[in-house]
Amino acid sequence: MEQPSSRLPFFTRIGTRVIYHLYITDTVVNYTGKARPAMAINGSIPAPVLTFTEGDSAEIYVHNLSMMETSIHWHGILLPNRYDGVSYLTTAPIEMGGTHYYTFPIKQNGTYWYHSHTMMQQQSGMYGAIVIHKKNEPRAKEHTLLLSDWTDENPEEVDRSLHNATDWYGIRKGSTQSYAEAIREGHFKTKIVNEWKRMNAMDVSDVYYDHFFSNGKPENHAMGFKAGDTVKLRVVNGSSSTYFWLNYGGGKITVVANDGKDVEPVVVDRLLIAVSETYDVLVVIPENKNYAFTATAEDRTKSTTLWLGMGEKVAADTMGRLKYFEGMKMMNDMMKMNGEMNDMGMKMSLQKMDMNTVMYPEAGGTKEIVTLNYAMLKSTEKTTLPDAPTKTFTFNLSGNMNRYVWTIDNKTVSEADKIMIKKGENVRIIVYNGTMMRHPMHLHGHFFRVLNGQGDYAPLKNVLDIMPMETDTLEFAATESGDWWFHCHILYHMMSGMGRLFSYEGSPVNPEIGDPVKALKKVYADDRKFHAMAKLGLESNGSDGELQFANTRWQLQAEWRIGLTKENGYETEIHAGRYLGKMQWLYAYAGFDIRHRKMEEPEKDLFGNINTKDDRKVFCIGAEYTLPMLVKAGARFDTDCKLRLQLGREDVPVSKRLRFNFMANTDKEYMVGFRYVVTKYISLSTHYDSDMGLGAGITITY
């Protein structure tokens, strides 16, 4: 591997030419007492800040010294399509040992950032800030703050776990919302209604994080400020999936720019910065003390702080634990039995009505808290579009939290056609969020107007946070060429397929990506990926288990039970099938069933027929449907002309770590059991099986 001493200088300026050399390497970090693999740029996480002045010409060499291909996307930067940095869509991937050269004119100013757009590399450390100064701009007192999230887990393992509906992250965060917790907090009915409507525990975030960082540290310091200074903070949310509440121990926050674009100053007590957004804010240092600018994760599990100034520390207001059952009660009212949201006659948009307020402990206090919303943002200059034909699209953000499927109009990127637009026309997008989570929707290569009631001065953005049940309208002038991604910037939602590709008609293909058909298949591969899940019970009465491979629609599943005696016998079922419907409550499958158990006399099933459950080799077809209370109802018919009906459920949350399972069918088989979660992969378990009897031991879950 190339040694650092042989590297070219990080920064060189020759007139208006600004040249950077970025070196991507694999590295090892230790943030929690455990060494973990990561990826760094020029040896640091976050990557170094890239600084330009409007009118410069950027020349950036990205050298890949890591052990995998990579990419760099210049988030919010207006540039030629071939340099946008999405591997196989706009730009060739940077292969191991390779170098990619980017060059583009700097024709904007503001706060932006850059990050990998390959697999889960952003979560592993590949992100950095970009600062573009205005021409002849007086240098103010300022500081760049890049916020991020960190997990010791391999991000690929996080993604796999989310797709397998693990509640381990809920256990770690204290957001399980079990029946014991519901009873203790007087919300037993709330929990029943929640599961009656086929919902799992509600949360505001998906992943448990070990740390949140301010410029790479849980606490960081900017000491060069004194009493009376007004400090401009350029805040970048470079996290993979965390929204942050921003508040300041020294008083009010004045917002002066969003996503790199200036807005009329807005004074607030706090603001929520969405994943991938940037804000420029002004704060005043009241006295010669050390004031906290704190970013608290939206789920309020942890926070990170940048200390401004020197001397006695002055903390920002702490944000209390969320009242999850109050949120669950609200969500019950908004959710219909068919899984769709009911706005109850409220027309919500622009973050003006935060439905999560019922969960905020501070909401009932006497202090009035001014929180930023998009309706407050007004551009400092007119942003009207040119007079041109307008093409309108309506998008419904959709998803299935139980199976971790995130879509637009119930289709992933790979399932939908490209959206064709023409250069010279205006494009309007009406977006409705029909899911229970917020989504920060990012458009590559363009700024869009957010229609927020400010008329000609509607703010320009490249990321729009859309809350549940909100409808927002954005519009932009189609002035580019090529393919541009519009996607949710929560990394795990994007990789699941929540996005669309806007494609300019008649655009040439970048020859660097090779065969465009093969290249596009690689783009689509992300949301077509199969994820593995396994469960192995090792108990005193035998072993039972499950192995599963599934993606957005399809699933291959094998189940088995092996007793310790001939009387206990063995059985296995293997099914391949497809999930159907928007909520994927229906699963249709085909497969086979092989089993044998030594019995003295044949039994009959509930239909009065000779029961073949103890000696069976059959092919079968069937379906499984999720009923209220998340009970799975199954019906299957086999080549022996036998019908079997079945009811069951796994992982009823009795307490924070205790789970209850049950199953019964018309073959007169039944099972009841408990599982106590010790770690993510190990549980203590016990169950009674009608064929295998009572057993106890451990269950290994992957």
Region locations from a protein language model:
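Outer-membrane beta-barrel translocator domains and adjoining extracellular loop/strand segments
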Residues: 85-87, 408, 456, 569-574, ...
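A structural feature that tracks compact, well-ordered secondary-structure segments
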Residues: 223, 234-238, 243-251, 271, ...
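Outer-membrane beta-barrel initiation region
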Residues: 504-565, 598, 617-621, 670, ...
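Intrinsic, low-complexity N-terminal interaction/targeting segments
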Residues: 254-255, 260, 408, 417-418, ...
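Histidine-centered copper-binding motifs that mark active-site loops
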Residues: 1-275, 281, 313-353, 363, ...
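Outer-membrane beta-barrel "beta-signal"
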Residues: 672-677, 690-702
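Transmembrane beta-strand segments that form the barrel wall of outer-membrane beta-barrel proteins
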Residues: 530-540, 553-565, 572-574, 585-596, ...
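Membrane-embedded beta-strand positions in outer-membrane beta-barrel channels/transporters
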Residues: 232, 280, 428, 473, ...
